[in-house]
Every structure is written in structure tokens, then in C-alpha cells.
Amino acid sequence: MTKDILILAVETSCDETSVSFIKNGRDILSNTVLSQIESHKRFGGVVPEVASRHHVEGITTTINEALVDADVSIEDIDAIAVTEGPGLIGALLIGVNAAKALAFAYDKPLIPVHHIAGHIYANHIEEPLTFPLIALIVSGGHTELVYMKDHLSFEVIGETRDDAVGEAYDKVARTIGLNYPGGPQVDRLAAEGEDTYSFPRVWLDKDSYDFSFSGLKSAVINQLHNQRQKNIPIIEANVATSFQNSVVEVLTFKAIQACKEYGVQRLIVAGGVASNKGLRQSLADQCKVNDIQLTIPSPKLCTDNAAMIGVAGHYLYQQGRFADLALNGHSNIDLEEYSAE
């Protein structure tokens, strides 16, 4: 009989303090998330210093709550997985140091996890990953297309050349006058409007899987500025719809084309923007037409959480990819360099 593998996972890369216990790479025994949205809302975005202070205040309580929810003890675990980057360095260090302290105190292996690898493996909780596949990464800091031929094998075939898609959403939301976090607000508003603006679709070079959203973002900002200068009424829902349609069309087209070119029948979506209803519907429609299997995590697993770190950590554990107590946080880590040999 195969022994169960129990991973304690810690995630503090941005503005959520999260701790999870994952059994055998898919079973979530607990996934505690302490959100900081209300604290950052008055600033219109995440303030790194504020985020770090909240992590310091909440990490111990979050660990204890996750332990109670999972009904396990730390002595039962096989290893401790923690996000080492990319992310806000101050925030990362809180989680890394907490994980190192536990690893030292309980003599457990320490597993460093790439934050984007975690987002990818959130899909494995919904449905086991089958390879090869294409992963579309859409978040506040990343927009990438990744080809995977096996577990922990990452080949970045496309990425943003300027703004990440989530960053563009937040800036457009602020220009419209919506509250933080802007992405979900734009998505909700887009469902009520009509596509009345001819905002650009940026395709870049022929056959390129790279993205660019700065031009689209600027077009929206300039359009609203000009209308306000001329006292022309603005229908915010129409702005949101037109902007979102431009974004979704490009993301969907490039993801489907990548699947076709690489000969894969599996597309997964990862990152906070994967919660976007417009994007989810567009991908579902086009995957159905092209006979591609689509997996998108439930919204609660799209945003930052420790469960996804624990799932990725499970496969790193199986490969024996451990760190010593000199582990540090890193604001930038290349996903391909992190890839298994």
C-alpha cells in the first residue's frame, strides 16, 4: 500500500496570507486564506510595506487555523512547500522565513515553489493534468503561454512585452472610476454593456505568441480623457465591454493557435484573471469548436492560495527538489530556469 504524502504549503507572494495542507497532490485538507483587499482598497492597489506588515501579523494565526481545519499535526507532514518567488520581496520573506522555521523545528524537507508553477497546478486539483498541454497564464503580473510536455516541464512560448493583462485591467478600471480590485469590477460591468468602441487588438509579429496591452490601455485612457475634455457622456459599461472584448479576443486566439501548432488537445488557464467570466466563456466556446479539452480552476483557486503551492510542491517532493535553510525569497524567477531537467 502506497504511503500518503502530506504537504504543508505557505503562500505570501503578494497580498494574501495562505496556508494549506495537501494530501497526495490533489486532496485539499485545508486551504486558509487571509485576504488584505480591504486594507489596500483605500490606496487603489497593493502597497508592499502594508502587505508585508499584514503577513507578519497573520502568518501564525493562518498556520494554526489551517492545522485545525485539516485536523493534522505538523509532525504528520512529509515536507513544507513555500513560494520563493516571483512576488513582492518583503511579502515573500515572511512566508519563506516561516517555512524555514517550521522545517528547522520539525526536521522536515523544505520545497521552494515558483508562484506561476503553483497557479498552473491549481488546475490539477480540478482535473488531473495530462500531457502535452498549453497553459495560458493571466494575472496581475504575468501573461504567458507555456508548453508543458510533462510535470514541471515549462517552455515559455509567449509572454507580454509590456503590461500584464491584470495590470491593464486595473489601470482601465481606475480610469473608468471603479474601485480596487479593478479586474472583477470591469468584468461585471462588461456584462451590461455593448461593444461600441473600436479599441485595438494587438497581434504583434506574424506567428508570435507574445502579447502587448499597453497600447490598448492607452487607447482606453485617451478615449475617456478626450470625452471628458469635450463633455461627451461616457457609458462606462460600453467602455468595459469594448476593452474586455479586445483583451479576450487576443488571448483566446493565441491560446487556440498555440494548441494547434503544438499539436495538443489540452488547454489550461491559470492566474487571477482566469476568474474573468468573459474570458472563460470565450475559451469554452472556441475549445468546443476546435475539440480541445479546457480546464479552468474554480474562482477561489484562481486567486493566490497555498493549495496550489502544495500541489506543485507534491511533484517537486517526488523529484527530491529540496532547499536548505539558506533559501531566500526572489522577486523575479524565470519559469524556464525553474523547469525540471
Curated annotation (Swiss-Prot):
It catalyses: L-threonylcarbamoyladenylate + adenosine(37) in tRNA = N(6)-L-threonylcarbamoyladenosine(37) in tRNA + AMP + H(+). It is found in: Cytoplasm. It comes from the Bacteria. GO terms for cellular component: cytoplasm. Its EC number is 2.3.1.234. Keywords: Acyltransferase, Cytoplasm, Iron, Metal-binding, Transferase, tRNA processing. InterPro entries: ATPase_NBD (IPR043129), Gcp-like_dom (IPR000905), KAE1/TsaD (IPR017861), Peptidase_M22_CS (IPR017860), TsaD (IPR022450). Required for the formation of a threonylcarbamoyl group on adenosine at position 37 (t(6)A37) in tRNAs that read codons beginning with adenine. Is involved in the transfer of the threonylcarbamoyl moiety of threonylcarbamoyl-AMP (TC-AMP) to the N6 group of A37, together with TsaE and TsaB. TsaD likely plays a direct catalytic role in this reaction. This is tRNA N6-adenosine threonylcarbamoyltransferase. It comes from Staphylococcus aureus (strain MSSA476).
